[in-house]
Regions:
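Sec/Tat signal peptide C-region and signal peptidase I cleavage site
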Residues: 24-29
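Active-site mouth of glycoside hydrolases
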Residues: 33-282
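Short, low-complexity, Pro/Ser/Thr/Gly-rich segments in the mature regions of secreted, periplasmic
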Residues: 410-419, 460-467
């Protein structure tokens, strides 16, 4: 069957499936949502739809996207080299065994700023700066942008996958960031931050438990310190700067929870995600302050119990595989001791490697590391969302995996050597008849093993079960 004919056949089926899945994703407000712990377990393995709805100019002195006339949502979605997202891409990830997608979204370009100060200067042969002081982003999100975000969320939900929606490059080290880990900045931006989250929450208040909100991405202090707060100060640590940063992170987290809960509906018990300072994971042993982002993070007060999740990010050098594995092991232990112990499960909202061109130059190490990372995280009850890659650029249009071996390593890290198979059998948590457990190739097993098995129940029915 030709690809063109197949697409004509598949797209209407996807549209019908999306309609039913989205309808079933809405849950009555009086029905109990699964706990945060259950949600993290049920996400299994995840991926980031990165460099897409999060794309932005990111530099007040070079607002190159905003210089375009008649900007449309697609201009931003494709600005960093990715195609317009199609539902077939998410279907491909679902069929491969991924059960969750994080959808990073940058909001500031799509609010009230006009960017009228951004013009081409013939004398300097450069764009004039964005005058943020006189062209404020305000508090209202543009409806065209919200509509596109809503469509992409629906693409994920329609596949019966978990979707994490966040505020992304409104934080970070760019000059356009307005969310900064500093007590004075928090006091100034609190109202705006809460207003944005109330709008997002209202837009999706009827969605069911498969949709989660993440309050903010990698929020940094006024010095743009990575690894831990105040690391970028001249002395490499400043207690005053650090204290302000950690206090601000906890304040933003509380504001986020309060704003979402105030909208009612299913948001009253929706699972919500809060990140540590910079989404730092405490990885490494080279500085005594590396654990501070974990230790200083507080679990926000919440009107409901068991519906909050912590998030960290991890990028590790894979040139030395043994060292990388040891770093993963220690990081997982530290997260369990210094963060999960506060009373909420944890996810790696992003993970990958700091090694340049690792897929081309250190592929065997990268593949082994990827599998090991997912295995270690799963053993520690930590969710994983790989950052970018796997299907990138034009490969997303086909769609296809342009790093299929890396995808396989991640999938086998969670499901075991046999990988993932979406067999059309009902799932069960029940025990099989002794001696009636088979692997996905039909081989009888002496006892259930890790991953997906086919089992015969006492009533004679056949089902599939994931054994952890």
């Amino acid at each position: 069957m030709s690809g063109k004919y197949r697409n004509r056949l598949v797209r209407p089926l996807i549209a019908v499936a999306m309609l039913f899945a989205i309808q079933s994703s809405t849950t009555a407000a009086d029905a109990d949502f699964e706990s945060a712990t259950a949600a993290v377990a049920n996400m299994r393995v995840g991926w980031n739809l990165g460099n897409t709805l999060d794309s932005n100019s990111g530099d007040v002195n070079n607002m190159w996207i905003e210089h375009w006339s008649n900007r449309q949502p697609a201009d931003y979605e494709t600005a960093w080299g990715q195609p317009v997202t199609k539902p077939e891409l998410l279907q491909m990830f679902k069929q491969a065994g991924f059960n969750a997608v994080r959808v990073p979204v940058t909001w500031y370009p799509h609010m009230e700023a006009t960017f009228s100060s951004v013009t081409w200067d013939n004398d300097t042969q450069a764009l004039t700066p964005w005058d943020m002081a006189h062209d404020d982003i305000g508090t209202q999100i543009q409806q065209e942008w919200m509509k596109r975000v809503h469509e992409v969320v629906d693409y994920v939900i329609s596949q019966d996958m978990y979707c994490i929606l966040n505020i992304h490059h409104d934080t970070g080290a760019s000059s356009t960031a307005w969310l900064i880990a500093d007590e004075a900045v928090y006091a100034r931006e609190k109202e705006r931050f809460e207003a944005v989250w109330r709008q997002i929450a209202e837009e999706f208040k009827d969605y069911g438990e498969r949709l989660l909100f993440e309050g903010y991405n990698e929020m940094l202090d006024t010095y743009d310190s990575w690894c831990f707060a105040s690391y970028a100060t001249p002395s490499k640590y400043n207690a005053t700067v650090a204290t302000s940063a950690y206090n601000a992170i906890n304040s933003y987290a509380q504001s986020f929870v309060d704003a979402v809960r105030s909208t009612g509906g299913n948001n009253a018990q929706r699972n919500l995600i809060v990140s540590t300072y910079g989404a730092c994971s405490g990885s490494g042993t080279w500085n005594t302050h590396l654990q501070d982002p974990l230790k200083k993070m507080k679990l926000p007060a919440d009107a409901v119990s068991g519906h909050l999740i912590f998030e960290v990010h991890s990028y590790i050098d894979v040139k030395n595989l043994s060292n990388a594995k040891r770093e993963v092991d220690q990081m997982v232990r530290d997260i369990k001791t210094n963060l999960a112990s506060k009373g909420a499960p944890v996810i790696f909202g992003e993970w990958g490697t700091t090694t340049d061109n690792a897929y081309d130059n250190y592929r065997s190490n990268l593949l082994a590391f990827a599998r090991y990372f997912v295995e270690a995280a799963k053993a520690g009850n930590i969710g994983t969302f790989y950052w970018m890659g796997l299907s990138n650029g034009e490969s997303r249009t086909v769609p296809e995996f342009n790093q299929a071996d890396l995808k396989d390593a991640i999938i086998k890290g969670y499901y075991g050597d046999e990988g993932y198979s979406d067999i059309a059998l009902p799932s069960t948590s029940g025990a099989p008849v002794v001696g009636s457990c088979y692997d996905l190739q039909g081989h009888r097993l002496a006892s259930p093993c890790q991953g997906i098995n086919i089992i015969r129940m006492s009533d004679g029915t056949v089902a599939k079960r994931i054994f952890n």
